[in-house]
A protein has these predicted regions:
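Iron-sulfur cluster-binding electron-transfer modules in prokaryotic oxidoreductases
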Residues: 1-183
């Protein structure tokens, strides 16, 4: 599967495309693991043209190409920084973009969700994963947010289970701020 993905994605890069990925674990895999697992020049090409979604959007902003005409305000957002974004040394690009929305206040929460890939979802580790995530479960409601966000869907699931909040991907909050409604 890796070789087929690399072949397909490398062809897209050669056509002038960038690979933009909304999931931090997936972008980490393409950037860091594919070159190591596949070892080919194509895998390195794919890695060098892969961007996390908010890494890409903030680059557009830096180049003056991102529309920042937001029509709705998200209020206070408790933003969970996923471990696979930290591992990519990207900083807090999602939080940075959310802060561009007028009237937003973003509190970054750097706590472990206890999921660790799918480890924390396995029956034998689930209770341990919840224990690991207890500091996160305390920090989210303590932030008194209007909204909760995480780029990582598994971390969002864990946050929902541990806090009762309904985390959303930051791009959903950005879409709301643009006034884009789901169909």
């Amino acid at each position: 599967l890796i070789r087929q993905n690399v072949k397909t994605l490398a062809a897209a890069v050669r056509e002038g495309r960038e690979i933009v990925v909304p999931g931090p674990t997936c972008s980490y895999m393409l950037k860091q693991e594919y070159p190591w697992l596949d070892g080919s020049d194509d895998a390195r090409l794919v890695a060098s043209h892969t961007r996390d979604l908010f890494e890409y959007l903030m680059r557009l902003h830096a180049d003056g190409k991102l529309d920042t005409n937001f029509s709705k305000r998200p209020g206070k957002v408790a933003y969970h920084l996923p471990c696979h974004l930290k591992a990519q040394n990207l900083g807090t690009k999602s939080a940075d973009l959310l802060r561009l929305i007028p009237g937003s206040e973003v509190e970054v929460i750097e706590r472990c969700s206890g999921v660790d890939g799918t480890w924390g979802l396995k029956k034998e580790y689930y209770k341990i994963s919840l224990k690991v995530a207890e500091p996160l479960f305390k920090d989210v409601p303590a932030a008194r947010p209007d909204r909760v966000a995480s780029d990582c869907p598994l971390a969002a699931l864990q946050i929902a289970q541990g806090t009762g909040a309904a985390p959303r991907h930051p791009i959903q909050i950005v879409a709301d701020a643009y006034g884009v409604t789901p169909e």
